[in-house]
Amino acid sequence: MADLAENVSLPLSQESFEDLWKMNLNLVAVQPPETESWVGYDNFMMEAPLQVEFDPSLFEVSATEPAPQPSISTLDTGSPPTSTVPTTSDYPGALGFQLRFLQSSTAKSVTCTYSPDLNKLFCQLAKTCPVQIVVDHPPPPGAVVRALAIYKKLSDVADVVRRCPHHQSTSENNEGPAPRGHLVRVEGNQRSEYMEDGNTLRHSVLVPYEPPQVGSECTTVLYNFMCNSSCMGGMNRRPILTIITLETQEGQLLGRRSFEVRVCACPGRDRKTEEINLKKQQETTLETKTKPAQGIKRAMKEASLPAPQPGASKKTKSSPAVSDDEIYTLQIRGKEKYEMLKKFNDSLELSELVPVADADKYRQKCLTKRVAKRDFGVGPKKRKKLLVKEEKSDSD
């Protein structure tokens, strides 16, 4: 132990550590003392409890030390979180973000047509749908255009819009890099990115914003809708809305527009049918609004008239009405009905001009003629007698 203490007392350095490492130290077994040997250690036992005064200054924070700040993860500094129910209201923003569609007719041969009255796009499956993006001021560098599809009705808005299992499993229209479950795709742009939100699982597609070319005021993005609206297991005849947003590279919203989409076999026919139904609905709504107003006016007019007196009603029965000389206009549809009613009117006018005595004489004369004519037709008619073989005429 003396040699070990002598070596340990040497100044510690890299060379002395090597000497200590090479030394073969013999471990000395230390036996615990017997119980009798603990008698001298009674003085080390605590006869009284430890009394320590509490120092409140230990928990005081000096004013010079900065307060601890909460840790911020990388998710907090990234793009803003996506809402569970995306907003569909239009928001042009400070840049005047707008959407335009090419003018097209309602012919049966068209593959894509837009109705301004309905704010609805009708297109066929996997056909090109050009959408023009217009801004009043250029967005910051790195801006992107996002397309997101959601269900229109509140009862279905929480569901994610996906393709039906049939169109996902077939090899047709599934050759590109886009995931098979995404409904909205971008055509002719290799820089498109297909996203799936980690919280809502909604599908969207992003393309970098491209400034308009020389001589043009809009940027065109070609979209495809890869499933019919009537597909079972997919949209299942549920109407959908497509939301187009202009965002910065960090995800800040710059503008938003939305429109309804119907994917069908004959876009022109369906657009024409829905526009006709919209006009009928508007006419019906207008009629229902005007009818109560007319009823209110009529009730007010009747209320403004004086109440009839019981004594005056007896006089009006004996005397002619005051309004007999008033002229009324009757609109009649059809010339035959007009001629018939005109004859009735002429006969009534003549009956008023003829005196009552002459009218009775004429009526009696017509009645006697009718009776005489009827009595004349009751008698037997004279006919020639038919000859029979056995009978002979007088000449024979």
Curated annotation (Swiss-Prot):
One of its GO terms (cellular component) is nucleus. PROSITE patterns: P53. Its cofactor is Zn(2+). It comes from the Eukaryota. Residues 262-269 are annotated as: Interaction with DNA. Keywords: Activator, Apoptosis, Cell cycle, Cytoplasm, DNA-binding, Metal-binding, Nucleus, Phosphoprotein, Transcription, Transcription regulation, Tumor suppressor, Zinc. A motif (Nuclear export signal) lies at residues 339-350. Binds 1 zinc ion per subunit. Residues 90-281 bind DNA. Zn(2+) binds at C164, H167, C227, C231. Residues 369-392 are annotated as: Basic (repression of DNA-binding). Residues 1-44 are annotated as: Transcription activation (acidic). Coiled coil: none annotated. The keyword Cytoplasm applies. Residues 63-89, 301-322 are annotated as: Disordered. InterPro entries: p53-like_TF_DNA-bd_sf, p53/RUNT-type_TF_DNA-bd_sf, p53_DNA-bd, p53_tetramer_sf, p53_tetrameristn, p53_transactivation_domain, p53_tumour_suppressor. Residues 77-89 have a biased composition (Low complexity). Residues 325-356 are annotated as: Oligomerization. Multifunctional transcription factor that induces cell cycle arrest, DNA repair or apoptosis upon binding to its target DNA sequence. Acts as a tumor suppressor in many tumor types; induces growth arrest or apoptosis depending on the physiological circumstances and cell type. Negatively regulates cell division by controlling expression of a set of genes required for this process. One of the activated genes is an inhibitor of cyclin-dependent kinases. Apoptosis induction seems to be mediated either by stimulation of BAX and FAS antigen expression, or by repression of Bcl-2 expression. Belongs to the p53 family. Binds DNA as a homotetramer. The N-terminal and C-terminal disordered regions undergo liquid-liquid phase separation (LLPS) following homotetramerization and activation. Post-translational modifications, such as phosphorylation or lactylation affect the ability to undergo LLPS. The nuclear export signal acts as a transcriptional repression domain. The TADI and TADII motifs (residues 17 to 25 and 48 to 56) correspond both to 9aaTAD motifs which are transactivation domains present in a large number of yeast and animal transcription factors. This is Cellular tumor antigen p53.
